Amino acid sequence: MKPVLCLGDICADLIIPYAIAAKAKASGTMLPGGSDVRAVEGGSVANTACAIARLGLPVLFAGTCGNDAYGLMLKNGLERERVDTSLLRFDDGKPTQLVLLVLDETGERTAFACPAHFGSQHSITADQIPADIIDRISWLHVTGMMLREDPAASTQLDLMRRCRENGIPVSFDVNVRVEAMNDPTFAENLMKAKTLSDVILGSAIDEIPLLAGERDPELAAKSLAENGTTVIVRNGAYGADLYCGTERLHAPAFRVEVTDTVGAGDTFDGAYIAARLNGLTPSDAMREANAAAAICVSRSSGRASPTRAELDAFLAEPSE
């Protein structure tokens, strides 16, 4: 099988267990073990690349990070998962993008990017992408996060267009918030990406409604799916819904104890892509994606996606 090309963000996540620290401070107790700030490999598309690789499919990652200790950590992290990093470039002029992830008492996160704009991940250029890339890949996965700034935005949109014209499936994780629409160029790029995608994935709370310009998640998904695009709405403990044309499929979530939600959507994306490339139906692919996400949230770290053996074992004893 030809590899999946994952083009997009890669960063170092600094996970800050604020709720644990605040509780300890309020009670006058010592911080529990394992409650320190942790630096881990992150980036939504990089996480998805690792999720696909752990499920046994070949993966090629294209992106940019700083030529520093964090950048080396990120490259080594991808290679440890057997992700091909030949299209990962070090930018000597920028430090590696950092994301501060502050966790509350439920494991939900609030993210702060550092820097907020013009980070290393937006430095990817068209010349990083080989001229024959269309002949070398089976699927392209991208994110809305890269559409904020050039050269990343134009590089991604051009590759999406080329893949669409040549029959290579394109999946697009929206992965932006409402403030994106305050930037006319960013908003325009999102609309372009919407028309170039075969599969659109996003959260029910904000991402799918934002992309469709419709506040109700179901109406938003239906409008995006009218032209035959597959639209997948992730909704946490409720599960996920798939829309395509007039078809709707619901896949319930698996019940697990939530430890950390970081990377759950990225894991879902990777498992869905892997399942479809392995020939599973949309319904079965959604079930596998929900199972993979459930395993992810029961662990700690954005790279908590399961291996093929772990996913199969979990599915053998479902707890939906």
PLM region descriptions:
Residues 131-135, 193-194, 225:
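A short, aliphatic-rich alpha-helical micro-motif
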Residues 1-5, 14-18, 33, 161-165, ...:
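Conserved phosphate-binding/catalytic region of the ribokinase-like
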Residues 1-64, 69-83, 257-259:
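Glycine-rich phosphate/adenosyl-contacting loop at the front of the ribokinase-like
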Residues 98-102, 239-242:
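Short beta-strand scaffold segments in enzyme catalytic cores
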Residues 139-222, 238-240:
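Conserved beta-alpha-beta core of the PfkB/ribokinase-like small-molecule kinase fold
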Residues 101-153:
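Conserved phosphate-binding/catalytic loop of the ribokinase/pfkB sugar-kinase fold
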Residues 59, 85, 170-171, 201, ...:
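Hydrophobic beta-strand scaffold residues
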Residues 64-67, 86-95, 223-225, 232-234:
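Beta-strand->loop->alpha-helix junctions that form or flank phosphate-binding loops
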